[in-house]
């Protein structure tokens, strides 16, 4: 589980396609190609191994899964989308997530920066984009409350 149910969603974006398996709570970036109109691959989002210089698209509110729907039914009670479908992304609001880089100990008020693999950190390295602000430290289970504030693109 990468997101706890305690959250406040102000603005979401459901116009982008994701073609890789991801967990809820990961911050994704815009792919370098296209717009996504007509369900093509141009407005795709992806997980960045090095987010330096990339534009964050939002925090994933659903899991992207790769299942064979001809062999099993989709579980509509889970927050999951199939690869190649539109993905709901949080662009403004706060969530409680465990997608925090290892060894990071943020405090309330620290800026939240995107680091590798969709995780968050409180230290900015060369070119890593700011995605919001930590609203508290990491608890005993590894979760932290984070306010995401991304410009509408």
PLM regions and their residue ranges:
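Surface-exposed, low-hydrophobicity beta-strand/loop segments enriched in small/polar/acidic residues
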Residues: 1-153
């Amino acid at each position: 589980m990468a997101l706890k149910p305690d959250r406040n969603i102000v603005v979401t974006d459901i116009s982008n396609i994701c073609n890789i398996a991801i967990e809820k709570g990961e911050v994704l970036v815009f792919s370098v190609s296209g717009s996504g109109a007509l369900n093509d691959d141009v407005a795709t989002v992806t997980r960045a191994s090095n987010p330096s210089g990339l534009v964050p698209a939002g925090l994933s509110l659903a899991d992207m899964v790769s299942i064979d729907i001809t062999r099993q039914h989709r579980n509509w009670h889970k927050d999951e989308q199939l690869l190649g479908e539109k993905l709901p992304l949080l662009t403004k609001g706060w969530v409680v997530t465990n997608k925090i880089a290892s060894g990071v100990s943020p405090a309330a008020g620290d800026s939240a920066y995107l680091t590798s693999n969709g995780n968050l950190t409180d230290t900015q390295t060369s070119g890593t984009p700011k995605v919001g602000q930590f609203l508290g430290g990491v608890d005993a289970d590894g979760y932290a409350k984070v306010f995401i504030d991304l410009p509408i693109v």
